[in-house]
């Protein structure tokens, strides 16, 4: 997982 712009939608 990671904290990015789209973290609300998916955790990469």
Curated annotation (Swiss-Prot):
One of its GO terms (cellular component) is extracellular region. It comes from the Bacteria. The keyword Transferase does not apply. The keyword Secreted applies. It is found in: Secreted. Its main location: secreted. One of its GO terms (biological process) is killing of cells of another organism. Active from 20 to 100 degrees Celsius. Monomer. Has antibacterial activity against Gram-positive and Gram-negative bacteria including Salmonella, B.cereus, B.megaterium, L.casei, L.viridescens, M.flavus, C.glutamicum, C.crenatum, L.mesenteroides and E.faecalis. This is Subpeptin JM4-A.
């Amino acid at each position: 997982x990671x904290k990015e712009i789209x973290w609300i939608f998916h955790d990469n």
